[in-house]
Amino acid sequence: MSKINFTALFYIISVFAVHAQKSNFLTPQEKKEGWKLLFSGTDLKGWHAYGAKEPGSAWKIDQDAIKLDVPERAGNKAKNGGDIVIDQIINGDFEFKADWKVTKYANSGIFFFVKEESKYKNMHDTGLELQVTDNTIYEGAKENTHRAGDFFGVANARLREINPVGEWNLVHFVMKKNKLTVSLNGFVVQEHDMAGADWKKRVAESNLKNAPIAKGIYSGLIGLQDWGSTVWYRNVKLRVL
């Protein structure tokens, strides 16, 4: 077995091992390393609607997960939905983990470095979006930056390691010493030098060109997007480095 195949097999086994564990639970090792749960599995304590207070009623607890419940899609916002963000502002280096799954043709995203200020109307005005979506939406389409694992409008994932609709996907986001790394289902799909010319150019040419991150300011909230379709999140964890 080649080294590459062995590495891939190791990650696959790790993914199955994670799913065999209890959801929304910190292991003794995670506690020792300083991880904290952002979602208890029972309520949305620690979260609020972007620019408001309580999350909309479309955000529910289902299957020990945060669920945006959209029985019938009608536009890009769910009735009584809206984007939600954590209460804690993150400054400096950190790690983030979560599981997500979607319904057919669903579209959502996990946002980082979100600023919640009156001059910003939407979460996506400032937040860097890691796409959460059913990639069949884009079957046959020209390569774009709107598929799962992509940074929306900024950078493509270098691999398309997505599980089928209805199955859980594991994302691991790390920002450390100006290096940004994202793994999806155990495979590294994004690696960027945030102080480098390539990354700065990508941000400057995106819809985030006027956002604080375009000026090298990487702090803020983490958010979950309501884009008018059903999606679940669980095992949402944070470690400040």
Regions found by a protein language model. Give the residues of each.
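Carbohydrate-interacting regions of secretory-pathway proteins
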Residues: 21-241
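Bacterial Sec-dependent N-terminal signal peptides
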Residues: 1-23
